[in-house]
Amino acid sequence: MSQFKTGSRADCIGPARGSNFGPMSHSAVPATEVVIAADCWRSEASAEATVLRAIEAAAAMVDADTGEAELAVMLTDDDGIRALNASYRGQDKPTNVLSFPAPQPDYQGAAQGSDVAPKLLGDIAIAYQTVRREADDEGKRFDHHLSHLAVHGFLHLVGYDHETDAEAETMEAAERRILAGLGIPDPYADQDRVS
């Protein structure tokens, strides 16, 4: 299903380039595999459930046909995401989340009920230490920040971006709407402080 192989981060291969998956007419929950590629995530017992809940909420609120789709989320560490970031973005440093949209074949004209394979949306990688550090530095709950990053990564897989101010505003509005549906405060405001 995934470009991320279960096991060590050395088993990860990178993204396929040139995604053209864009918004379609309806949404449904994609099959989502969560791969724990770094032991540090095991201290967060609810991390997998948090990610799955965020992906489900995002899929339910965006205008993209994801019901027959598959994606993988790799929960890695700073070393793992740093290697991916260096290899695919030329930035030799850790980051919080990376998304690797898969290229999409043209399914138009495929007969209903045919043997057309599910769409691979792509892969998301999330780094534990960076997520933990950002949540602590910003006074946010870890699960809220993890949810935000899973939603952010998913939105990239279905065609959202933030290269321009207008794109960023659209993407942030979608993130706020999805997270509000999960009872999570606006991640761009100061209201999610841990007391």
UniProtKB/Swiss-Prot annotation:
Pfam family, one: YbeY
Disulfide bonds: none
Nucleotide-binding in keyword set: no
Compartment(s) of residence: Cytoplasm
EC number: 3.1.-.-
Record key words, sorted: Cytoplasm, Endonuclease, Hydrolase, Metal-binding, Nuclease, Ribosome biogenesis, rRNA processing, Zinc
GO cellular component entries: cytoplasm
Entry annotated with the keyword Nuclease: yes
Any one GO biological process: rRNA processing
Function statement: Single strand-specific metallo-endoribonuclease involved in late-stage 70S ribosome quality control and in maturation of the 3' terminus of the 16S rRNA.
NCBIfam families per the UniProt record, alphabetical: rRNA maturation RNase YbeY
Protein name: Endoribonuclease YbeY
Organism: Rhodopseudomonas palustris (strain HaA2)
Taxonomic lineage of the native organism: Bacteria, Pseudomonadati, Pseudomonadota, Alphaproteobacteria, Hyphomicrobiales
UniProt gene name: ybeY
